UniProtKB/Swiss-Prot annotation:
The exocyst complex is composed of sec3, sec5, sec6, sec8, sec10, sec15, exo70 and exo84. Component of the exocyst complex involved in the docking of exocytic vesicles with fusion sites on the plasma membrane. Belongs to the SEC6 family. Transmembrane segments: none annotated. InterPro entries: EXOC3/Sec6 (IPR010326), EXOC3/Sec6_C (IPR042532). The gene is sec6. GO terms for cellular component: cell cortex of cell tip; cell cortex of growing cell tip; cell division site; cell tip; cortical dynamic polarity patch; exocyst; lateral cell cortex; nucleus. This is Exocyst complex component sec6. It holds the Pfam family Sec6. Its main location: nucleus.
Length: 752
């Protein structure tokens, strides 16, 4: 191909692509949409940037304004110092005047101090009388604010006096003053304790109606805090000047005062009172024989904090959130303590329920969300409460179930007496009843929590334990049956059939218990977990039904093993004179009678179907008996007689249509192949394969080969016809297996 031709091919291909691609027609639409979205995004970003720049500018202006005021204040203080220095220079006798002024001030201050010292005892007595009168009357403490005012003045006097004494340089003077102020110190401490005690019992004050007392308390706290703020401001300003220029601050009121941090002390009282209440509740739980924890006081106190206290306290205190934080911190601490100790699962469940009520309480009463309060709660699906409860629950359920399972297995293996009988006369194991009573009780408890995380994890744990027990039961049942069928039954305790019947009954009941007990709790599960739990639920129910079916199958295996010796005589020469079929069906009848008395009704129908199928399979297997022979019409007559015996026994309990379908394989195979000749064998074989697609060719050949009413050449020809017919058949092997899939030669495995 030339280069020009190659280029033309490429151009044509590109043109074809451009002509066929529909996206190019919509390209302009996409561009317009992207441009609109970009314009919208740019506008949004621009608006947000403008807001951010505006906020930054306002912040810079505020900082600049504060800096300007600070510089101005320092300048004014510097000017004052300059004026003082200038005054000294302008007036020749200024030092003398200043000295005389200080002497006068000192004399006046000394006179005032002496007067106050003389009146100190009287003043303290007045304050004590005021407080005593209020306390004795159990009133709203009308004198509390006045007493605080007087006491504050006395404290200022004390601080000033002690400060002045420290400047004199006499070591004994401060000690003397301290002794003089001993009564004042005691009164001051008692007053503080009184106010702090009121704060500690603030909820009791509300309940008793002492609202005015609470208002006065917070007025006192606010006054103390205000004095602390003034002192901090003075100290901050003083610290910004050289030591040589701090003289003017010494005369400022409050400079000699000590920080009292009253707001912090009040907060500590709130915390201490809450901690005491929580500790009291915990101790009461430990000492209470019922073992119940009660935290209802939290709701009572927080309701007061949310509705009453905000109107009685300064807004800056944010009293509602303060108490919410205090109580939530105590609640988290209580949970931590419970986890660190050997706490019963019931307490964890109570705490989980309480947290749900706690959140609901906040939604209905608090002016803020519970998630805004620190520290955060531990009630989420990954929180410590759910983890510990589910861990402890699973551990306890595992311990209880292991004990019950081991007890049931011991009873099952020893078989020292008959199984337990329920009110309907059905066999069962006591451990199963106790286990589901325990599970039902626990499910009822967790259902009341309405906590989907707890319910989901607990249900998952329960079903895991159930599935584990199912696996263990399968192993135990398989082992016991193997010993029973090993050929030495004398070494095995009797009664295996009865106990298999009990296990089958119990597991069918368990499937029903699952529907009645666990299924109702799924409405509490979140949709994200429901699918997995329903899958586990279905698997667990199927497991119980499977064990019940295994129990029935193993009972049938025991029956089949009992009749095995009698089956070996079928189709033998003496079978035509005396068939063992009556002995075989009588054995089945005996087992059926035992089962109908002690088997749950729904399971009995399954047992009948399996037993009749087992008889059919065993009968067909007998075709492979050694020396088996089929004498034409005589064999047909005897087979019909055998089938009639079986129908007579099973017909007492099964419907006619079930009986016909059960024994039809014998008729289709034996009666068909025994009645067939060279002309009809193909038709009989075709009818057999139509009804039972998996009927083995070896079984058909065995019947034909053992016919004694035909010559060997004819039999060989019939076998060739059957083989040819079998090869020509188009069979769908994806169909459900029939009873013939279980019919094997004597060397095959037995039905268990």
């Amino acid at each position: 191909m030339t280069a020009a031709a190659s280029d033309d091919a490429v151009y044509n291909k590109v043109a074809d692509i451009l002509r066929q691609c529909e996206d190019f027609h919509r390209l302009s639409t996409h561009i317009e949409r992207f441009e609109r979205e970009q314009a919208s995004l740019n506008m949004h970003v621009k608006t947000e940037l403008e807001k951010h720049v505006e906020a930054v500018e306002l912040g810079k202006l505020a900082l600049h304004d504060a800096q300007t005021k600070r510089v101005k204040l320092l300048q004014e203080l510097h000017n004052m110092l300059t004026l003082c220095e200038s005054a000294r220079e302008m007036v020749d006798e200024f030092p003398l005047i200043s000295r005389m002024s200080r002497i006068y001030k000192n004399c006046y201050a000394t006179k005032q101090m002496i007067s106050q010292l003389n009146n100190l005892v009287k003043e303290t007595d007045v304050i004590e009388d005021m407080l005593r009168e209020d306390l004795e009357l159990d009133s709203d403490m009308p004198n509390l604010l006045r007493a605080h005012y007087k006491l504050s003045k006395l404290r200022e006097f004390r601080e000033e006096a002690l400060y002045q004494a420290s400047l004199e340089g006499q070591s004994d003077l401060p000690i003397t003053l301290e002794n003089s102020f001993s009564n004042l110190n005691t009164l001051s401490d008692n007053f503080d304790r009184l106010v702090l005690n009121f704060c500690r019992n603030i909820f009791q004050l509300v309940k008793s109606g002492h609202i005015k007392t609470i208002v006065q308390i917070f007025k006192i706290v606010e006054a103390e805090e205000s004095s602390d703020e003034v002192l901090k401001s003075i100290r901050d300003a003083k610290s910004s000047l050289p030591d040589s220029q701090d003289g003017p601050f010494l005369s400022l009121q409050g400079m000699t005062r000590q920080l009292r941090n009253f707001r912090l002390r009040v907060l500590e009282e709130f915390q201490g009172a809450a901690a005491e209440n929580f500790q009291r509740a915990w101790v009461s739980y430990l000492e209470d024989g019922s073992g119940e924890l009660n935290l209802d006081f939290i709701f009572e106190d927080l309701k007061v904090a949310f509705y009453v206290l905000p109107d009685l306290t300064p807004p800056s205190y944010n009293i509602a959130k303060t108490f919410a934080s205090i109580y939530q911190e105590c609640l988290v601490g209580l949970v931590t303590k419970a986890v660190s100790l050997d706490t019963p699962a019931a307490v964890y469940l109570y705490l989980i329920n309480f947290h749900r009520e706690y959140r609901k309480f906040f939604e209905e009463n608090a002016p803020f969300s519970v998630d805004e309060v620190e520290p955060g709660l531990e009630d989420g699906k990954d929180g410590i409460l759910v983890r510990e409860y589910t861990r402890l629950f699973t551990q306890k359920i595992r311990e209880w179930s292991d004990k019950l399972f081991q007890s049931s297995v011991d009873t099952f293996m020893k078989r020292e007496s008959e199984p337990e009988l329920d009110s309907d006369g059905n066999y069962g194991l006591q451990g199963t009843i106790i286990f589901f009573q325990m599970i039902t009780q626990q499910i009822n408890i967790i259902s009341h929590t309405n906590n989907s995380d707890v319910v989901g994890i607990v249900l998952s744990s329960i079903m895991y334990i159930m599935q584990s027990m199912q696996d263990q039961w399968k192993s135990v049942m398989r082992s016991e049956l193997s010993q029973q069928l090993s050929g030495n039954p004398e070494s095995v305790p009797p009664g295996l059939m009865e106990y298999l019947l009990a296990v089958a009954n119990d597991n069918l009941k368990c499937a029903g218990f699952m529907d009645n007990t666990l299924l109702n709790t799924f409405e509490l599960i979140t949709s994200e977990r429901e699918e997995d739990l329903r899958e586990a639920f279905g698997k667990t129910v199927d497991g119980y039904i499977l064990i019940s079916d295994i129990g029935v199958s193993q009972i049938v295996a025991i029956i089949s093993n009992d009749v095995k010796p009698a089956l070996t005589s079928l189709f033998q020469p003496n079978w035509y004179q005396s068939s063992n079929m009556k002995l075989i069906v009588d054995t089945f009848r005996d087992y059926i009678v035992d089962c109908i008395e002690h088997m749950v009704p729904g399971l009995f129908d399954v047992f009948l179907l399996e037993a009749s199928n087992a008889l059919t399979i065993s009968y067909l297997r007998s075709i492979f008996n050694k020396n088996a022979c089929f004498d034409g019409d005589n064999a047909i007559q005897q087979i019909r007689s055998d089938i009639a015996l079986a129908i007579r026994v099973f017909g007492e309990y099964m419907a006619a249509e079930h009986l016909r379908s059960t024994f039809e394989p014998i008729e289709k195979l034996l009666l068909g192949m025994l009645d067939a000749d060279v002309e009809t064998v193909s038709e009989y074989f075709h009818l057999l394969k139509e009804a039972y697609w998996d009927a083995p060719l070896s079984l058909v050949e065995a019947v034909l080969q053992n016919r004694t009413d035909l010559e060997k050449s004819i039999i060989k020809k019939m076998i060739d016809i059957v083989r040819h017919e079998n090869d020509s058949l188009q069979i769908d092997t994806s169909q459900q297996p029939t009873v013939f899939s279980q019919v094997t030669s004597l060397s095959g495995s037995s039905i268990l």
